[in-house]
């Protein structure tokens, strides 16, 4: 009997070791709020590895998308990443210019976005409209347009640095879509007069807002859903501006010349109903596929499709010029 037990234990240990040896690793670069214990990453990883026991997902977190993209650009073709997850439509051209990403084999007919997505290299995994979030119990008269937000000196505002944050970059695009070139500097100056802080990333700025450091914070129209669903609070709301809203589409991409079947499978898994539910409820963003994912987010998605969307085509040179204008204006 002892010999049988010893044989069984040895077999089990050998099987475990063999499985570990046979596992294929997938290195995923992403932003820290996705990979954190409360983010979507661990849940997506767990369910993916359960469905694909031959695969092991390893996350490398970065404090912002800007920092992530800079790392990828520096590493170039020597990057250890198999997948880069967390770029967005406003970083798209810069990411393409790195030359390190390859087309994926994911079926795009599953996608259901406000505008048709045809890019075969960068795969959407969630989306949402930028908005300013406020506490209804503290701010009874919220701004009804971006211009009103800029001009009202009784409002205190927090937003993110467009050089390092994708959310901050969204405001940069939004401001330049609403204000003509000859008015944009004065608009930034007006906004700066009642800006409390410009933070490096979304997490620290939203945290500062929740501590009561400002009336409004740049975030997403989905953000109040977090407080409703997870904190049972309905005092937070998102602005609905007359000029329309800018939509952010978050993206994942495969690194070229890194043959890895598990990485290909993980890309496809990102837009499965299982992964989408984890992503939308942790990221507090909207699902990118058709069908029922989560009732509250599904309802908001239908509502947002009726909102005015202003999504100008923006190239890298424009963004560089806009950032330079913003930076110069704020340092004068």
Swiss-Prot record:
Localization, UniProt:
Periplasm
Leader peptide range in chain numbering = 1-20
Q: Which UniProt keywords apply?
A: Periplasm, Signal, Transport
The record ties this protein, via InterPro entries, to:
SBP (IPR006059), SBP_1_CS (IPR006061), ThiB (IPR005967), ThiB-like (IPR005948)
A cellular component term from Gene Ontology for this protein is: outer membrane-bounded periplasmic space
Single biological process term from Gene Ontology: thiamine transport
Q: Name one GO molecular function term.
A: thiamine pyrophosphate binding
Instruction: Classify the main location.
Output: periplasm
Q: Which residues bind thiamine?
A: 202, 220-223
Entry's family note = Belongs to the bacterial solute-binding protein 1 family.
Spell out the subunit comment. The complex is composed of two ATP-binding proteins (ThiQ), two transmembrane proteins (ThiP) and a solute-binding protein (ThiB).
Summary of the function given for this chain in its UniProt record: Part of the ABC transporter complex ThiBPQ involved in thiamine import.
Spell out the protein name for this chain: Thiamine-binding periplasmic protein
Species, as recorded: Haemophilus influenzae (strain ATCC 51907 / DSM 11121 / KW20 / Rd)
């Amino acid at each position: 009997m002892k010999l049988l037990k010893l044989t069984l234990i040895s077999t089990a240990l050998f099987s475990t070791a063999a499985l570990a040896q046979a596992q294929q690793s997938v290195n995923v670069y992403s932003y820290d709020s996705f990979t954190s214990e409360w983010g979507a990453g661990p849940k997506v990883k767990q369910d993916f590895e359960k469905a694909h026991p031959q695969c092991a997902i390893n996350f490398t977190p970065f404090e912002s998308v800007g920092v992530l993209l800079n790392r990828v650009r520096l590493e170039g073709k020597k990057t250890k990443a198999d997948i880069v997850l967390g770029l967005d439509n406003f970083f798209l051209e810069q990411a393409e210019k790195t030359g390190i990403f390859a087309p994926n084999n994911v079926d795009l007919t599953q996608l259901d976005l406000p505008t048709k997505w045809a890019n075969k290299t960068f795969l959407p995994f969630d989306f949402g409209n930028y908005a300013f979030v406020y506490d209804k119990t503290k701010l009874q008269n919220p701004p009804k347009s971006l211009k009103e937000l800029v001009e009202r000196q009784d409002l205190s505002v927090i937003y993110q640095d467009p050089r390092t944050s994708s959310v901050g970059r969204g405001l940069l695009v939004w401001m330049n879509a609403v204000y003509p070139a000859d008015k944009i500097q004065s608009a930034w100056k007006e906004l700066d007069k009642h800006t409390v802080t410009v933070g490096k990333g979304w997490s620290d700025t939203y945290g500062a807002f929740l501590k009561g450091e400002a009336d409004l914070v740049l975030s997403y129209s989905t953000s109040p859903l977090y407080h409703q669903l997870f904190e049972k609070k309905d005092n937070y709301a998102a602005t609905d501006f007359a000029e329309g809203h800018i939509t952010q589409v978050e993206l994942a991409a495969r690194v070229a010349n890194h043959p890895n079947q598990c990485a290909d499978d993980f890309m496809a898994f990102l837009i499965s109903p299982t992964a989408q539910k984890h992503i939308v409820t942790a990221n507090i963003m909207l699902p990118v596929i058709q069908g029922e994912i989560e009732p509250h987010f599904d309802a908001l998605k239908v509502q947002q499709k009726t909102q005015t969307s202003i999504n100008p085509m923006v190239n890298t040179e424009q963004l560089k010029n806009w950032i330079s204008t913003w930076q110069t204006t704020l340092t004068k």
